[in-house]
């Protein structure tokens, strides 16, 4: 199993202390988190994309380019990049450039994105967002794989024998499809033979397990080898401590503050108590053995081989968050790496693709 640390780069007051860092300092924290993730042995570091408050992750390609410059080994992920909002040509140019700057360490997780404010900002409607996502990915995928592309498009000017530069370092690149609430993303991933990444954050396991089950069914429907299927899954929070009592005591102020924030902003409160949250959500809060057992329970339902945890302290003190990550890597990760297989593909950077030939593939 592989482990990612991800951030959506939320920028709001600390849920416990109420203190708020500057925008500049928040970005420096992201870079510090990436360095720490590599230092502790995480396999990937992800940056989300949001275009509405309280997030400042509107340019993940730019942030990940800086992360690439301050790291050497760890793979870099978009978590997710919102192709339904973007021109696929510009998205391709940005990520092909990042692919080179990172020496081929880039993985993409794509999705339609969440939030009415960012849909309004880009003039995307709930009715057309899925069609936009599918079309943008189709064009993006062709641009990455082919030297010239012709495509009749609905949501951007059509392409006619188009060349787009730079050509990528990895060819093809691995693209995951983020899945939170809809079978559309699961079906799109299965259709193209791409891996699925379940958000697995807001609710108990059942709706996410149903989407993963649907993805596996559609994977076989489209004729792909069941042995090549790959699933990733997120977590709603992380705090590992020597004992469950210590973990719950440290996390309780975080949970209470987050629940109060949800109530104030009109968000649904799914878990009323910390104990219920620790038991029925995907959050990994407890002793090392409790965390190991919980990941196994989720693996029994998902069959996932990649797991993401939160890179941000999120209300914990910096020292307590680091201690949690260190304990996770020292006592949790080795056991899970032994028990759960790796994804069915190489994780390391691949060799550059040979130079383009004069032959052109038409679409």
Residue ranges: model-predicted function:
Residues 54-78, 132, 136, 326-340:
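Alpha-helix-loop-beta-strand connector modules within alpha/beta enzyme cores
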Residues 3, 37, 41, 49, ...:
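Conserved, mostly hydrophobic/aromatic
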């Amino acid at each position: 199993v592989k482990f990612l640390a991800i951030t959506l780069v939320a920028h709001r007051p600390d849920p416990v202390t109420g203190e708020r860092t500057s925008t500049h300092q928040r970005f420096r924290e992201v870079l510090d988190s990436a360095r720490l993730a590599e230092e502790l042995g995480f396999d990937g570091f992800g940056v989300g994309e949001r275009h509405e408050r309280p997030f400042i992750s509107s340019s993940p390609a730019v942030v990940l380019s800086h992360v690439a410059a301050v790291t050497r080994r760890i793979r870099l992920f978009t978590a997710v990049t919102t192709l339904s909002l973007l021109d696929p040509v510009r998205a391709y140019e940005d990520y092909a450039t990042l692919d080179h700057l990172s020496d081929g360490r880039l993985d993409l997780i794509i999705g339609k994105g969440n939030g009415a404010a960012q849909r309004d900002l880009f003039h995307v409607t709930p009715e057309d967002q899925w069609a936009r996502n599918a079309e943008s990915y189709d064009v993006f995928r062709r641009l990455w794989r082919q030297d010239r592309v012709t495509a009749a498009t609905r949501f951007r000017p059509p392409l006619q024998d188009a060349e787009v530069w730079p050509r990528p370092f990895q060819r093809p690149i691995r693209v995951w499809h983020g899945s939170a609430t809809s079978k559309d993303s699961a079906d799109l991933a299965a259709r193209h033979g791409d891996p699925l990444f379940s958000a697995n954050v807001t609710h108990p396991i059942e709706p996410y397990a149903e989407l993963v089950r649907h993805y596996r069914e559609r994977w076989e429907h489209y004729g792909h080898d069941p042995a090549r299927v790959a699933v990733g899954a997120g977590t709603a929070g992380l705090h590992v401590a020597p004992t469950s009592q210590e973990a719950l005591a440290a996390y309780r102020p975080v949970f209470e503050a987050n629940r109060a924030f949800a109530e104030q902003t009109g968000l649904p409160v799914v878990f009323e108590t910390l104990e219920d949250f620790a038991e029925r959500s995907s959050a990994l809060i407890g002793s090392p053995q409790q965390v190991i057992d919980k990941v196994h329970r989720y693996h029994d339902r998902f069959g996932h081989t990649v797991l993401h945890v939160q890179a941000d302290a999120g209300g914990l003190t910096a020292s307590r968050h680091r201690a949690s990550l260190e304990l996770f890597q020292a006592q949790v990760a080795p056991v899970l790496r032994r028990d759960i297989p790796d994804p069915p593909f190489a994780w390391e950077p691949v060799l550059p693709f040979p130079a383009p030939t004069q032959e052109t593939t038409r679409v």
